[in-house]
Regions:
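Enriched for short, Lys/Arg-rich terminal
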Residues: 1, 12-15, 57-95
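Arg/Lys-rich, positively charged N-terminal/basic patches that mediate binding to nucleic acids
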Residues: 1-30
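Conserved short hydrophobic interaction patches
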Residues: 28-35, 89
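Secondary-structure boundary motif
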Residues: 16-19, 34, 38, 74
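Residue-level signal for pocket-adjacent positions within structured domains
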Residues: 5, 12, 40-45, 87
Length: 95
């Protein structure tokens, strides 16, 4: 089972999102979490590496909604991810 953590920046970004955007992210996150467990991401989430940021990945949760994350080490079974940023496409400038 995957575990997750968030950066302070992610939490600050989260507070700036509208209620609608938060709901959109939650829907996408449920799909992401299931796909992570299955070992394959569906194309609609467009999970891919962020250019110029080795080890950082992005997930699309709305037409202009992005969330960035990285894989981290943990003891035990399953992956551990750290959510770094969330917001518009602009977050990719400082993922």
């Amino acid at each position: 089972m995957a575990t997750y953590a968030r950066t302070r920046q992610f939490d600050r970004d989260w507070r700036r999102l509208s209620a609608t955007d938060r709901d959109r992210y939650r829907i996408a996150f449920r799909k992401f979490d299931g796909d992570l467990s299955a070992g394959r991401f569906r194309p609609g989430l467009r999970v891919k590496g962020v250019q110029g940021a080795p080890g950082v990945f992005e997930m699309t949760w709305a037409p202009d909604g992005r969330a960035t994350f990285e894989y981290a080490e943990r003891e035990g079974a399953g992956p551990h991810l750290i959510w770094r940023r969330i917001g518009t496409h602009a977050v990719l400038a400082a993922p």
